[in-house]
């Protein structure tokens, strides 16, 4: 057992000052120097995967195998940005209307970035903010969830051991009230939050009041649509994985299962069998496939949601043997007969509960998928991938997968629309708010033909040496046209032929 004291306001202010001082030197380091820290952090995670994974399972209860997977994913994200950040943030020559103009869009570090992160993926949520920002030259301060303090401390130690200077990454045992102090501090230049709708509204308002950049990921109620030609066996298997991964405590879990009439009966029968096969128990035991919830309070809240849904007219189908009464377990449950006047119809269920909807056809499936305040992820299952893409285009959400639940990968943009938040993280970070975008222009003096700056653009920006000469020849076309930029509100497509 360990205890962790909250910081005082004075300590918070001192840590911000330390972070700002570190930023002055960290932002001047080369990409190679910053990449060395991220690569070493990735290597440490892999070398001591068991140590880091066991801490996750002990602290928040997830299956040990899934904890190992999270450690691996976190290492991949560190490596991904170490490898790609310099290219992502490379200056971009602008095609201007006048041939006399020589303009370039450059990225400059922002400064101190505040992260406010949840407990369900204790390392992944941190590395998603830390890796791109550290590689961009920013420094990061994070208030992690109060129920994973040891994982929060372990991540800070990881980066220190990897060579990050003191102040480059700071773990904050801060109170909710101190978040206002942090966001109001002029040295804090941006905020990244993953959390509830209410928390997001408060943080966004505070950041907006201070005219600061922010990105928000506020949960979701992802729809999994099974079309008439879907392979039922494969779709049921993916539906169980998509709904029950991480004990069902995942923002991009397949929470709403929408199935067309032609296969609905068969699907529901097989889905019930699949959930009944889950084995509740010790998350360190390899035979366990259903872990406890993160806390008894979370389990109680979810059971109350189920009860309220049934009282409002839904039918609850409990699946499998009764779960243990000792521990924060919740019985895997399918809710059916949900109508729009039932509050559960629009709610997010954070745990092993699936909402099942039967629809007449594709159009109704799309309408139902879009009838939600949320818009984080979603998926379409069909044996016709091209048609699946066309259906996916009609779904109002931030990420859509074909024949696979929403994925978490370093090279796929992560972000939602509607009340699921705004801004994207992961993948190409140029447009994710981690850097300032600055347009630099040089124009020749028409009287002399000489430029009105004393140095040519490559001399002014000596750090542009990685770019080819053709990129910078006036009038030449961009050499990086294959780079994809992801803007807030853009839907990410991810297709698989596995179904």
Question: Could you say what each language-model-derived stretch is?
Answer:
Residues 139-141, 214, 316, 399, ...:
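A short hydrophobic/small-residue beta-strand
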Residues 457, 461-499:
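Thiamine diphosphate
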């Amino acid at each position: 057992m360990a205890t962790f004291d909250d910081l005082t306001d004075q300590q918070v202010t001192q840590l911000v000052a330390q972070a700002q001082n570190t930023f002055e030197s960290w932002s001047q380091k080369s990409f190679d120097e910053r990449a060395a820290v991220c690569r070493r952090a990735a290597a440490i995670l892999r070398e001591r995967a068991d140590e880091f994974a066991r801490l996750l399972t002990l602290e928040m209860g997830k299956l040990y195998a899934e904890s190992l997977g999270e450690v691996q994913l976190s290492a991949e994200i560190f490596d991904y940005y170490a490898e790609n950040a310099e290219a992502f943030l490379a200056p971009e020559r602008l095609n201007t209307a006048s041939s006399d103009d020589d303009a370039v869009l450059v990225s400059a570090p922002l400064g101190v970035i505040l992260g406010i992160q949840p407990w369900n993926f204790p390392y992944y949520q941190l590395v998603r903010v830390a890796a791109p920002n550290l590689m961009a030259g920013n420094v990061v301060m994070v208030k992690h969830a109060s129920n994973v303090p040891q994982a929060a401390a372990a991540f800070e130690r990881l980066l220190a051991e990897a060579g990050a200077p003191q102040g480059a990454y700071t773990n904050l045992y801060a109170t909710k009230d101190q978040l206002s102090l942090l966001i109001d501090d002029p040295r804090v230049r941006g905020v990244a939050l993953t959390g509830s709708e209410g928390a997001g509204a408060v943080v966004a308002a505070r950041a907006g009041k201070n005219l600061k950049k922010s990105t928000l990921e506020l949960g979701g109620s992802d729809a999994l649509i099974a079309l008439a030609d879907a392979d039922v066996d494969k779709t049921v298997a993916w539906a169980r994985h998509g709904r029950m991964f991480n004990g069902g405590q995942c923002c991009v879990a397949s929470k709403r299962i929408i199935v067309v009439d032609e296969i609905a009966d068969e699907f529901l029968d097989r889905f019930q069998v699949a959930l009944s096969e889950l084995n509740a128990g010790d998350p360190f035991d390899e035979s366990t496939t259903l872990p406890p919830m993160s806390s008894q309070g979370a389990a109680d809240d979810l059971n109350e949601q189920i009860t309220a849904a049934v009282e409002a007219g839904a039918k609850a189908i409990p699946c499998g043997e009764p779960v243990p009464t000792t521990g924060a377990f919740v019985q895997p449950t399918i809710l059916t007969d949900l109508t729009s006047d039932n509050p559960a119809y629009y709610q997010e269920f954070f745990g092993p509960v699936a909402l099942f909807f039967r629809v007449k056809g594709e159009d109704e499936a799309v309408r139902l998928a879009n009838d939600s305040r949320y818009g984080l992820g979603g998926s379409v299952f069909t044996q016709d991938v091209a048609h699946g893409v066309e259906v996916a285009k009609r779904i109002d959400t931030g990420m859509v997968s074909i024949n696979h639940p929403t994925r978490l990968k370093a090279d796929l943009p992560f972000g939602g629309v509607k009340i699921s938040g705004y801004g994207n993280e992961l993948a190409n970070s140029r447009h994710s708010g981690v850097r300032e975008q600055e347009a630099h222009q040089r124009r020749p003096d028409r009287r002399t033909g000489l430029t009105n700056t004393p140095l040519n653009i490559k001399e002014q920006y000596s750090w542009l040496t990685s770019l080819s000469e053709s990129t910078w020849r006036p009038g030449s076309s961009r050499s990086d046209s294959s780079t994809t930029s992801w803007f807030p509100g853009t839907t990410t497509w991810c297709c698989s032929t596995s179904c």
